[in-house]
Amino acid sequence: MKLFLIIILFAPISLFSQDEMGNWLMYFGTNKVSQDWSIHSEVQYRNHTIAPTNVDQLLLRTGVNYHINKNAIVTAGYGYVANHVYESAQTNAEVNEHRIFEQFILNNYVGRVKFEHRYRIEQRWVNSDYKNRFRYRLMLFVPLNKPKIEKGTVFLGLYDEVFLNTKSTFFDRNRLYGAVGYQFSKSTSLQIGVLQQQVSTAGKFHLQFGLTFNPDFTAKK
């Protein structure tokens, strides 16, 4: 825990004071309901500014996971995204999106480093338009003070994710992410980091706080 706090406190102050930086507050949950099945839950509150007072998007996502084995998971789910224009006086979302998604996650290890490959296909209804999109994310988890990520571990979370459309503009966006995380318990961890999102020729940085809570509802008390 001390190492986690030291890294966060000594992060470059200039990085967190950029006027154009956004802020994402995130919750992720994988709730195991049987040996092979679990429920995914997710909430992301995204802001145009670093202060959480100018909402950009509210994303709600859920899904059903089937665990093929400990390193392979398939998911089918639904997501809703409410999009708000920067500094808009309107309280309701200007653009509403409903999406269905199919996903496959495959994990492998090289030494102490975990590599997580996530493949996702999305069917999107953006207001009255229908779109398809493919996403691939490669994420690395690197424990710093222990051989593996367990209770009390400080770790790095690093990923790159590319988004591709099936029509119109082929390239949709790319996200590059780096964070420091702390594993509080088997089910709970926190990551604090920065994401750089590139859309066409425009790019923006986002300060991120991500809480993960994965209770096992099958565990005997």
What are these regions (language model features)?
Residues 18-77, 84:
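Start-of-domain marker
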Residues 21-23, 56-58, 96-100, 130-136, ...:
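Residues that define the transmembrane beta-barrel architecture of outer-membrane proteins
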Residues 101-104, 140, 205-221:
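Outer-membrane beta-barrel "beta-signal"
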Residues 1-23:
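Bacterial Sec-dependent N-terminal signal peptides
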Residues 43-49, 78-84, 108-110, 121-125, ...:
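Transmembrane beta-strands of outer-membrane beta-barrel pores
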Residues 31, 66, 78, 106-108, ...:
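Residue-level signature of outer-membrane beta-barrel architecture
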Residues 39-41, 74-76, 115-119, 136, ...:
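Transmembrane beta-strands of outer-membrane beta-barrel proteins
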Residues 19, 33-36, 71, 109-114, ...:
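Short loop/turn motifs that connect adjacent beta-strands in outer-membrane beta-barrel proteins
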